[in-house]
Regions:
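Conserved amphipathic alpha-helical interaction elements at protein-protein interfaces in regulatory
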Residues: 99, 112-116, 143
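Active-site acidic-Proline motif in GNAT/NAT acetyltransferases
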Residues: 94-100, 128
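Conserved G/P- and acidic residue-centered "switch" motifs that form tight phosphate/ATP-binding loops
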Residues: 70, 101, 118
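Acetyl-CoA-dependent GNAT
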Residues: 3-85, 89, 94-96, 107-108, ...
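C-terminal "cap" of GNAT-fold acetyltransferases
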Residues: 120-172
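Loop/helix-junction capping segments adjacent to catalytic residues or to phosphate/diphosphate-binding pockets
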Residues: 13, 100, 131
Length: 172
């Protein structure tokens, strides 16, 4: 069966569990790097509760879930920023699934979702400590650019043109 990627409601149990895992990992990594500790549990809960994922709901966005042999193991989101630009966000795979090719499949699914939303380019931001993410994006043809936002947690910004040939958009 292998890897599959499909649309998921942001409020599904699967999506909520993946959002919690993603947020916990990126928050803990930031705090460990900058303050030498994991995220305070109360702060972690506030952060998780602080995003309902509304920006990832059609028609302006889409949440995708990666599954391996049917088991949900990762996610990615896209949201329209303007008529031709979408942002890639929440790209995540459980640690035990990394290095198995799923990240490339997940990002390809997100690129297809962005095309389906009408985007001709996809932008994203990431942090310096997320070295593996930066390597992935460069390997997949993303180019480092000037900042497209003022996120406190962003150190690197990337962009990729989404070539859309007639009839090339796949349903997700």
């Amino acid at each position: 069966m292998g890897w599959t990627v499909g649309a998921e409601a942001v409020d599904s149990d699967v999506a909520v569990a993946l959002w919690r895992a993603y947020y916990t990992e990126v928050s803990d990594r930031w705090y460990l790097l900058h303050e030498g500790r994991a995220t305070d549990p109360d702060e972690l809960e506030r952060g998780i509760a602080g995003s309902d994922g509304a920006e990832l709901v059609p028609p302006g966005g889409q949440l995708l879930v990666a599954r391996y042999d049917g088991e949900p193991v990762g996610c990615a989101g896209v949201r329209l920023l303007d008529v031709g630009t979408a942002e890639l966000t929440r790209v995540f795979l459980y640690q035990r699934m990394r290095g198995k090719g799923g990240a490339a499949v997940l990002v390809a699914g997100a690129e297809d979702a962005a095309r389906a939303l009408g985007a001709a380019r996809l932008v994203l931001d990431t942090r310096s400590d997320l070295v593996e993410a930066r390597r992935l994006y460069m390997r997949l043809g993303y180019t480092e650019t000037e900042p497209h936002n003022s996120s406190r947690y962003a150190d690197h910004w990337f962009c990729k043109r989404l070539d859309v040939a007639p009839g090339s958009v796949r349903e997700i």
